């Protein structure tokens, strides 16, 4: 499903259409969100931006890249959780029109198409970056990317192609044929990996570490005992049974990895 990503940066012109600001989320009236619709060529994309009204006029920004299912409620929930930490978080739309896939086969095809068209990946993640940094309450100099499964791989490769990200945090993301680059030297990388993830063999881990060491990139690689692929998503156990995939939710790994991310942020990307 995953292919080596090699492509060149290019500039984008974009038009943003912001939708209504949503009502308060959950029980915290300070937590706000809005939908944003934007275009690349003739295709529309639907992002989701969350923030907390806590007296800070400008905050660091976080791109949240969804799993291969698409921009669903899970990705938006993670954006809300990051907003609660005093960041502005944007759950991005990598497939267009806010598409969410219901079957593993369709999701795999969609993700595979993105990875087999690296210019498309670059165009879409860069556009999302431009949307986030255009927000008045975002500190344009301090942006990171957080990704889950498919999204973790996208986030890593976004840094590798030169997107100016201070931090990348990948949760159970694929590492197949990953190639680092000189352009990643200023990006700190956190990998949160399930030790029992059948989709991330030791050879991929060894290659990843070798690539990072080659360019002197600061990174931490966390392994969570007994955790499989998609260990942070409570829906994954049901999906694994439904589609006969070796994935399952792991509460201990979910909580530990979230705390590891917070600790990593405190070192390299504190909310200001």
Regions found by a protein language model. Give the residues of each.
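Bacterial N-terminal signal peptides
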Residues: 8-18
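Acidic catalytic loop of the alpha/beta-hydrolase fold
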Residues: 196-200, 229-230
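Short beta-strand/loop motif that positions the catalytic acidic residue
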Residues: 191-193
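Short, proline-enriched alpha-helix->beta-strand connector loops that line the catalytic pocket
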Residues: 184-189, 215-218
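Short alpha-helix in the alpha/beta-hydrolase fold that links the catalytic acid
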Residues: 78, 201-211
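Primarily recognizes the serine-hydrolase "nucleophile elbow" in alpha/beta-hydrolase
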Residues: 125-185
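C-terminal catalytic histidine-bearing segment of alpha/beta-hydrolase fold enzymes
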Residues: 215-272
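Serine-hydrolase catalytic machinery in alpha/beta-hydrolase-like enzymes
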Residues: 35-137, 234-248
